């Protein structure tokens, strides 16, 4: 299991007192492909409740900037992740509103919601948000 996947699993809201967690997704764009190498984690300044996460701490941007510099510009900000206290998460109205207002970029942005049993993965491109969870028919 990769370190990034292990970190996502460690923040799942498995107990009734668990609070939402979240951060940035960092990695490399290789043409049409995206390789996730790192994430920022919740920390000082962030707002965390059972049903809400607000990324407020400066440490998220500092990690993006640090990895960008260390990699000579290869590692970049790819998007956002956070948890939901549900087995099979779906974006809330608040999630969608936040992504549309706050994620302004020319490149597609990765969106991940970590649930207790599964995850929701999506891409935001312009004002379009699409789930990547649908199965692809290979027949």
Task: Label each residue range with its predicted role.
Residues 1-77, 86-139:
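Conserved beta-strand-loop surface patch within small alpha/beta domains used
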Residues 83:
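Conserved residues at the C-terminal ends of beta-strands
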């Amino acid at each position: 299991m990769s370190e990034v996947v292990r970190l996502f699993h460690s923040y799942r809201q498995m107990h009734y007192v668990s609070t939402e967690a979240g951060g940035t997704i960092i990695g490399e764009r290789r043409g049409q492909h995206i390789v996730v190498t790192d994430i920022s984690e919740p920390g000082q300044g962030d707002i965390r409740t059972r049903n809400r996460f607000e990324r407020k701490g400066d440490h998220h941007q500092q990690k993006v900037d640090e990895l960008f510099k260390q990699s000579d510009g290869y590692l970049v900000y790819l998007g956002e992740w956070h948890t939901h206290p549900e087995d099979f998460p779906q974006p809330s109205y608040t999630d969608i509103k936040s992504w549309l207002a706050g994620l302004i970029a020319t490149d597609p942005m990765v969106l991940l919601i970590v649930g207790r049993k599964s995850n929701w993965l999506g891409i935001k491109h312009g004002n379009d948000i699409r789930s990547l969870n649908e199965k692809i028919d290979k027949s």
